[in-house]
Structures are given as structure tokens and as C-alpha cells.
Amino acid sequence: MYPELLKWVTIYIIIYIVPTCNVPSANNMGNLGTKAAAFAAFSMHSRTMFHVKHFHRKAPMKKKTKPLRPRRRLVGGIFLLIALLLAGFFGYCFALSRVLRVERATVYLPDLPQSFDGMTVLFVSDLEISGLSSAGEAASLMRRLALLKPDVLILGGDYASGSLMDALNGTRDEAALSAARQRFFSALADFPAPMGKFAVAGEQDAGAAQMEKEMAAGEITLLNNAVGRVSLGGESISIAGLAPQGEGILDYSGLSRSFQKGDCVLAVAHNPAAISAVMTAEAGDSGVWCDLILSGHTHGGQMILGKHSMLTLSPQETRYPAGWSKESGVFILVSQGVGCEIVDLRLGTEAQVHLITLRRGLAL
């Protein structure tokens, strides 16, 4: 702005002011000299302005771009931070899956015979063994649980399942799963449960005939829509094992009618989707036919984020996701299980087994 103003001021001086100036001179040449000097000054100023303008036009072309290295470092740092956060998150979820809690509970049953007052039941479900090494870990776990000295051991199904790679590839090695189950069941031969060891099958397990063969090595009784009886002091209680959901219609009336009101019955169903059918079935003389229902399968959702879970549960399973409840005088337990489906990760849930003490009478 200022160079332009100076230029026009100079022109104005030359044209209008210089001719009228009273410059001391001997003749007209003095006035002409003054004009020439002014013109020369203007010419020099014009050249100066040209160079200034030329400089201002060229300067933007010489501007250097900023180096990209700091930006690349920033992006790399962000990705590294995200990777570390994800690694920490999944590491935490994996650690949760490896911590087993022994949940203790006391249940009061009015129909429990006096001889069984104080009897303890260890309920273990959903081991989800994925190979021989995993079977060895499960066997080692059971040796530690033997220190609890339960009177009865009840296994809740889904003993072996495929690995993450099997799930991704859509494959299932039945021979390998059978070998893993056999190793686990064989390790239970010395498990101290003086009143018996009972089990039901889950949807991921083999057929009843194959499961009976595998469990025989561990002296475990498979209950597939069948009843096991425990006797003590001339009295007895019944353990009714229900077949997995995939084997026929959920109608347990044939089983329930074999009992009378007042009998003490523990019902074991791998999937809590069967609980509604168990509750609607009636005893031979009508009324509720069981006192306690034990179930598993859901893993509690395994990973819980807000109202969403990693596992897709049916409406029936969602009704009994995990924990204790009571309906029509019947106690219901849905365990979150020991193992995990597909991958060993938990969030908002826990690996658990249950040591249940049965007492005669009504809850205080």
C-alpha cells in the first residue's frame, strides 16, 4: 500500500508542484534541472518499486513445505497406543477367565431327609476342554477341588469343545475331543465323593452311548433322562438327570410322574432352556416334583458390555442367564461354568464351581 502511495505522490509533485516552485536560478535551465532531478528521483523510485514488487511476487514460490516426519510419528504413536490398550484389555479378559471362584451356598429343603441334613454337593459345569493339554489342566483342577471333600459330585455337561481355529475353519475333530474327555474322566476315578458321582451331557457332547463308555473309566454315572438314587440311614434322595435339548421334545412328564409329592429330588439340566419344561411337569400325585434345579450352559454371557453379551442366548436362556433364583418353592442355580466358549476371555462374568450344603427345613 505505501509504495503505491509514494509513487503517486511523486507523480503529483512532478506535474503540479515542480513547475510552480520558486527555485533560485540564473535562467530557465534551473527550472528544467529541477524537473530533471525530480524525474530522475521518480525513475529511481520506480525501479525500486519494481524490485520490491518482484520480490513480493517471488517470495511465496520459495516457501518451503513442512516436513511430514512429525505427523508420521504422531500417527504411529496413536496406533501404538491403541495396540497397547487392546493388548491390555484382552490380557485382562484372559486373566479373568483363568481365575476360578468356589461359590458356597446353603439351601434349605423341606423334603430333605434327616439323614442328609448337612450333605454337600459339588457342581461343576462347562469345562470346555479343547485338547489333551487342556484335559490335563482340568484333571489338575479336579484334584484341587477334591480338597473340598464333597459328598456328591455332579457334572453339568459340555466337557469338550473345539478350539478357536476349529470355530474359524468350521471343523470339529470328534476323535480328538473324545480323547480329551476320556483323559479327564479317567482322572476322576480317585475323586473322593462317597455318595456318588453323577453327570449329564450337553449339546456339544457325544451321544449317550459314547458318553457312558467314556465316563465308565472315572466311575461316573451318566443320567440321560434317568434317575440316580443316594441312600443313607434307610432314607434316600433322587438325582434326576435330563437329556440335552437336542435329543427330543422337552417333555419331562414321564420322568416327573415317577416321583411323589414329598420326595426330595435334585434335577440337573445342562441348558436352562429346559427349566420351564421342568417347572410345568408335575409329580405323580400332582404338584411340584423337584426341590432344586442345577444348570449351566450360558457362561453368564461370558463377556458382558453394557446390556450386550458375547454369546447369543435364546429367550429361554436369557430368562435364567446366571445365578440363583426361586420359583414355586423350587431353588434354581445356573452356573457360569469353568471354561469358555471358543476363546478364553471373560468380562463381567467369572469362572466358578459351586459347593452347596443341603439343610433340612425352611430358609430362615
Description of each model-found segment:
Residues 13, 45-73:
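N-terminal Lys/Arg-rich, disordered targeting/topogenic segments
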Residues 61-112:
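N-terminal membrane-anchoring alpha-helices
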Residues 109-122, 220-221, 228-241, 260-264, ...:
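Beta-strand-turn-beta hairpins that frame and shape the catalytic cleft
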Residues 119-221:
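Membrane-embedded segments
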Residues 123-125, 153-158, 196-203, 223-226, ...:
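Active-site neighborhood of phospho(di)ester-bond hydrolases with catalytic His/Asp-centered motifs
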Residues 209, 213-226, 232-285, 346:
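Binuclear metal-dependent hydrolase catalytic cores centered on His/Asp/Glu-rich metal-binding motifs
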Residues 273-354, 362-363:
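Conserved beta-sheet core of the metallophosphoesterase superfamily
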